[in-house]
Amino acid sequence: LLKDETLINCYNDFSKNLDKYDSLVTVQYAKKHAWFNNKPINYDLKNTPNSQDLTPIMFPTFNVMICKTSSLLETKNVMTENCLFYQVEDNEAIEIDDQLEFDVAEFLYNRFKNENK
């Protein structure tokens, strides 16, 4: 569900910043109560905020990945220390790992296709 303009913008932003960044990865931000090892990691359990008041957590979507060849060969990873994170809209960040996610993506695709007629 990635838009053409997002691909173009990613390429242009990375190209303009080759002196600063080795790679670009698309990301989305979420305000969710996150836990690890049975403990909250982004809030105090004694003072649980509403989710809309949480600091957004960034998640790579890997919809678009751009990396300098030299950096990729050196790190063997598209996410480098000098990575440009490009935020995409939630509907562009849909991941398809199972049937339910495929059904959601198909529904959204058809909805956006019909809206753009």
Q: Which stretches of residues belong to each language-model region?
A:
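Conserved core of the sugar-phosphate nucleotidyltransferase
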Residues: 1-89
